């Protein structure tokens, strides 16, 4: 049963960046971790999926790769890796500091993601911060990878919109079903 005093839910969402419309969402209890929702999404070959670092799971990312789809995700932690190809430090062209092909060193990580992945370190001048991205897309430029990740912000704007405009400040019932119905109606 959901609590009436504190919103204990999560809305796991897959948004089409081109239309800014959710193509999938699932409402769960707040205890369900984001990474579990990766198993619920439908992945299409050649499509690109951009994830927050809370979704960093090498085995699941490898499954996306095996399905012929692309992923972009921010680095979580400092996984040990070896450089297969690429420069350790670039001249900062287009604010790209590193563009490397890497292989994970730890046996556990190699088992989860046995392939080669691309590691990009990008300086975002508007935020005065450096970001590290992992992707299996070796076709797009490093700058385009960083730009696609920046578009992930549309998900955050979607949730901000929900909170501001859908008036789901208090749930009308305490049961899980009541909360789900209220959120579904608000989104529709």
Residue ranges and their predicted role:
Residues 2-188:
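Single, function-defining residue in the core of a domain
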């Amino acid at each position: 049963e959901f609590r009436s005093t504190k919103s204990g839910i999560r809305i796991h969402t897959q948004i089409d960046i081109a239309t800014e419309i959710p193509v999938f969402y699932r409402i769960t209890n707040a205890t369900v971790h984001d990474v579990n929702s990766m198993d619920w999404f439908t992945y299409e070959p050649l499509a690109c999926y951009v994830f927050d670092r809370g979704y960093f799971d090498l085995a699941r990312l490898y499954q996306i790769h095996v399905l012929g789809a692309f992923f972009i995700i921010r680095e979580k932690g400092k996984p040990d890796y070896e450089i297969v190809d690429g420069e350790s430090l670039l001249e900062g062209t287009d604010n790209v500091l590193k563009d490397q092909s890497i292989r994970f060193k730890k046996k556990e990580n190699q088992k989860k993601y046995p392939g080669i992945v691309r590691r990009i370190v990008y300086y975002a001048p508007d935020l005065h911060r450096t970001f590290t991205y992992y992707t299996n897309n070796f076709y797009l430029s490093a700058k385009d990878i960083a730009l696609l990740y920046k578009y992930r912000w549309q998900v955050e704007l979607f949730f901000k919109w929900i909170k501001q405009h859908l008036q789901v400040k208090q749930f009308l019932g305490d049961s899980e079903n009541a909360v789900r119905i209220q959120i579904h109606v608000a989104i529709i």
